[in-house]
Amino acid sequence: TVYAFSTENWKRSREEVDGLMKLFRSYLKKCIKISRDNKMKIKIIGDISAFAPDIQESIRKLEEFSKDYDELYFQIAMNYGSRDEITRGMRKMAQDVADGKVSPDQITEDTIGSYLDTAGVPDPDLLIRTSGEQRLSNFLMWQLAYTEFYFTDVAWPDFHKAELVQAIEKYNQRDRRYGGVKEE
C-alpha cells in the first residue's frame, strides 16, 4: 500500500493540491498498463467522493480493469486517513446493526475489519517509513497492530532498490511474536 494523498493533504496550498491532482490524472491512466503487464489487482482505498468526477471515473475504470488479477495486489491510499476509514466503517456497521443485519454480540475484530477499506487484504508485514519520520501519520492504524516498522532517513524520491533490500533484510532478522513471548 502506498500512501499517495491523506485526508489532511487538502490543507496544503491550492497550487500543491492542483499539482497532485494533475499527477493523479496521469498516473491512474498509467496504472492500467502496469496492472496488465504485471497481472496486478489495484485497489484505491480512502474516500474518493472528494475527488473531481474525472478522477473518480479513472479510479472506477482502473479497479474494474484489474479486478480479476490475482498474482499481485497493490493498494493506493488516496484521500485516506485511518481515523476517517474507521469512522466511515463504524457508521456502516452501526447502520447494519440498526437494520438488524448484524447483532452487537456478533461483532468481533474480524467483523470490524470487514467494514474497513482494506477488507479482505492481509495486514501489512512491514511498514517502511521514509524521510526520517517516526510516526504513523494517520495511516492504517487498525491494520498495523502487529506490523514490523523500518525507519530510514532516505527521502521517498531517493528510496531505491538497495534501500528496499536493506529494509527486507532487517525485517527477516526479526522475531515476530504477535503479542507472545520470545521462545528460548
Segments the model singles out, each with a brief description of its role:
Residues 1-184:
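Flexible, compositionally biased loop and terminal segments
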